[in-house]
Amino acid sequence: MRAFLALIFLTFVMNVESSRPLMAFTPSHGWMNDPNGQFYDSKNELWHLYYQYNPNDTVWGTPLYWGHATSKDLSTWKDYGATIGPDRDEDGIFSGNIVVDHNNTSGFFNDSIDPRQRVVAIYTYNTEGSQTQHVAYSLDGGYTFEKYEHNPVLDVDNINFRDPKVFWHEPTNQWIMVIALSQQFKIQIYGSIDLTNWSLHSNFTGGLFGFQYECPGLIEVPAEGTDESKWVMFIAINPGSPLGGSSNQYFIGSFDGFEFVPDDSQARLMDYGKDFYAFQTFDNAPKESGVVGLAWASNWQYANLAPTKEWRSSMTLARQMTLASRNMNPETKVLSLLQKPIFGESVVAANKISKRNITGQDEQAVKIHKNSTGTFSFDITFSVDSSKNQTGQLQVISGQNGESIRAGFDPTAGQFFVDRGNTSGLKENPFLTDKTSAYVEPWKHQNDLPVYKMFGVIDGNLIEVFLNDGIATLTNTFFIPGTEGLEYLEIESSSDAIHIVESEVKELKLRATS
């Protein structure tokens, strides 16, 4: 028998709309997909999020808008609905981003507009026969926009040319755009001094193919424990990713303002779950916040079928990104992305229980009862003695109808997993993969035993698991029809092979903030 560690989440039958995530952003109604245009307003200390939005239905379709939401802390959101719309109902405002044009390089602003709120959107305008890049600017800090009268600003006569990500590159004193020639598997890099006139600098090709590339990003990311940083290129794949359907890959390298050169030939996956796509970072983020971004928590294989009512799709929690050198196996250590979830000041623990030194024979458990929000976090550090081969489980359980979402660790294989096979929502869909998994080396060794860390968040119908301080992550949605969410949560270990060094469970809620 193999020693086995698992988390099980069971649910109480209530109302499907109650499965809406509490902290991860969802639209108040309608359809949502890619995050767009994230930026930080340093004047009002406010995070802005835009998103692909169909307010007229809960499936993708035209006319497609940018929706808009804001947050003081990246956890409590205010939704404003449609913000930028197409000129015709059959067209769409596709993905792009927003920059803060502090120095008015575009010439769109006069002195009455605070430099911290000179907001310019760069996006793909989609018609039946073309994809071109357009610009719009805001005179009120990002709530309404005026379209540039000389659009498009970039047209290469290709119907699969989309998703610009623009940022200011200080060393070369220019704006940089990365954009996908999607079905050529090519990321083009352009430069501009004014956001309206663009020159091609170079092309980046590489990585896992799939069907096409989308939603690229390029940003400088600090390396933990050093004063150094590296550039990271993000590329989304859909369909045909190695995990099935949609996923994100990334590359670590150098950028001189003209060309991105990866350090190695490896394409790294950003997340090992099925529901993490179109990741983008926030422009103008405060230095103390670091590199902050989020992704769409869905997969194009089944996104239009998710069994929610008035709304469809959520974002992930916001994540802080750093780089660190970590072992991929006992012989090789490489620089990799670390992802840590961000909890704003509005997130508080309605209940919290911590326990240490739990073994299977102790038959101890950590329990939180009568949950009112359906939102939990769990933080577990455990060691594994592979010489003891008794089955064991670490469980989070809630009663009544027997459906469950599980997360866990198999010490024999040395791999973590998320299992949503015991949920009935979309159960017959062949693409709603039951199980996803990730391999990581031990976080450390103590008393000659491997030690692992697993932190997780269950937020409505979304689970995000962060392994060994975020060296690997697993993000999955799950659908239990008629569920309110978790009624209570329990952690227990029943195997001599697994020793829980420490554990903490929190029932989370949001409090009002100023």
UniProtKB/Swiss-Prot annotation:
Keywords: Carbohydrate metabolism, Glycoprotein, Glycosidase, Hydrolase, Polysaccharide degradation, Secreted, Signal
Sugar attachment sites: 56, 104, 110, 197, 203, 357, 371, 389, 422
Enzyme class: hydrolase
Main localization category: secreted
Chemical reaction(s) catalysed: Hydrolysis of terminal, non-reducing (2->1)- and (2->6)-linked beta-D-fructofuranose residues in fructans
A Gene Ontology biological process term: polysaccharide catabolic process
SMART domains reported in the protein's UniProt record: Glyco_32
InterPro entries membership: ConA-like_dom_sf, Glyco_hydro_32, Glyco_hydro_32_C, Glyco_hydro_32_N, Glyco_hydro_beta-prop_sf
Enzyme Commission designation: 3.2.1.80
Residues that bind substrate: 33-34, 52, 60, 95, 162-163, 214, 300
Primary role: Exo-inulinase involved in utilization of the plant storage polymer inulin, consisting of fructooligosaccharides with a degree of polymerization (DP) value from 2 to 60. Splits off terminal fructose units successively from the non-reducing end of the inulin molecule.
Protein family: Belongs to the glycosyl hydrolase 32 family.
Name recorded for this polypeptide: Extracellular exo-inulinase inuE
Organism from which the protein derives: Meyerozyma guilliermondii
